Amino acid sequence: MKKLQLIIILFSLHSITFSQRKHQEISKKEGIKSIGMLKEFLSIPNDALNKEDISKNILWSTNKLNDFGFKTKLLTTSSLPLVVASKKINDKLPTIAFYMHLDGQSVDVSKWDQKSPWIPVVKKLESNKWIELDWNAIEDKENENIRIFARSSSDDKGPFIMLLTALNVLDIYNKEPAFNIKLILDFEEEKSSPGLPEAVAKYQTDLMADMLLILDGP
């Protein structure tokens, strides 16, 4: 009887380990596939002081969110607009709002060790120096300690793409989030969000949620 119990336990542990490994492999695969989307987004300049830059980022992000099944709305203010995107899973579920910003600070291009802050590159640290690699290096298992260099890669375009990638992984497993999703996208955070207080007062219904999480860097 004890031997049978031991066999069952060992089999269960093996099944759990195999399942975890499978999930990790799929997540990593989808993460690598999402790099193209991140690279495309990072290639759009997003200087918070440049309205033309911001307009292009608003257009790109809303189009992408629509592709992922979100309903988007532009919240106009006396400053630049915000975007609120909603994905309703079930009316009975709570709604979690995620605040993030997609603008970036102005840059001194001469201080960047690459052609442009808006031409993303892959680098690896070797002998205390960052060496630029080919983008295919991302798929090489031997190159796990590499970084993507571009303006706003971590603060804050990276988390935006990470969230969309996570939703894509859930779709692969035919799973749904356990809550309704609302995204609040600020395009002036790097200049103290002048339109945010006005939007909060003016669009209370659009911004209403049961919980708010701030995604400001991965």
Residue spans of the language-model regions?
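Short, well-ordered loop/turn elements at secondary-structure boundaries
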Residues: 1, 92-93, 207-208
